[in-house]
Amino acid sequence: MSTNNLDIKLNCNSSGQTIVTHQYTTHPLRLSGVFRLDTTDPRTAYLYLINTSPGLLAGDNLSLSLQLEKGTSVYLTDQAAIKVHAMPMTTTKANTNIKIKVEAGARLELVAEPIILFADAALEQTTYIQLHSRAELFWSEIILPGRLARGEWYEFRYYLSQLEITSMTEEICFRDAIHLEGKQNIFKHRDLFAAKPVLANLIVVQPHSDLEVLSQKLENLEAANCPDLLLGSSILPNNKGLLLRALASKTPQIKKYIKYALNCVRNLTNRSSLPYISK
């Protein structure tokens, strides 16, 4: 029996459509049914990850396993933002563990909704992605240092994220770690963080693509119509892909840019732009 809260496997049916062939769920995670939102691309399955709880609480330990078999194509997003609630006892925290495997010719677009770090929240997140050399990946996350609309800002305890991408033989392709302090952050009043508190991270892996050309497109903030965004990109070791980090004053700006970035990648591979994703 799976020890994960959500265990998903996807494969292609005889028509070439991506379907869910295995699904095991326990509270509080659920998976939506498959949506076919693009009539020009019946191969791609559009899925929502649903958390039926109010959010992450002290002591929560959520695990998700996602396996894409050969030739599958998946767009996965959350139904709503991930709220990390107060954990005033310094010995408590919440944990999330994500394990992903993407086989040859498969494609994963994982566009997460924002993680909102409430006052006194503490979250540790690990993401492990095993990627075939002929697999494609678009991965994004957004981090909010509080309920900004309420004036809550950097009152959380800490956020720790560790991400690792390996080959199918477990050779490390890329490793990244973010340790973001909240209350104890000595830089939170600096102009950079005060003016642009919304943080986003993006990873793009496109085999056999010209990463220099793609990087130039993704850094074109005029074309993205996001002139106020701060953005930096770098090519991953051994030309495995691209890492981008962005800062913005508001969440809609970041979401707008992520959509632009995903459409750039789609256009590069002769796919239609992202259809409307209802939330």
Swiss-Prot record:
The organism's place on the tree of life at top rank: Bacteria
MF-aspect GO terms: nickel cation binding
Segments forming a coiled coil: none
Alphabetic keyword roster: Chaperone, Cytoplasm, Nickel insertion
InterPro entries noted in UniProt: UreD (IPR002669)
Cell compartment(s), UniProt: Cytoplasm
S-S bridge residues: none
Chaperone keyword on record: yes
Cellular-component GO terms for this entry: cytoplasm
Function: Required for maturation of urease via the functional incorporation of the urease nickel metallocenter.
Family per record: Belongs to the UreD family.
Protein name, as recorded: Urease accessory protein UreD
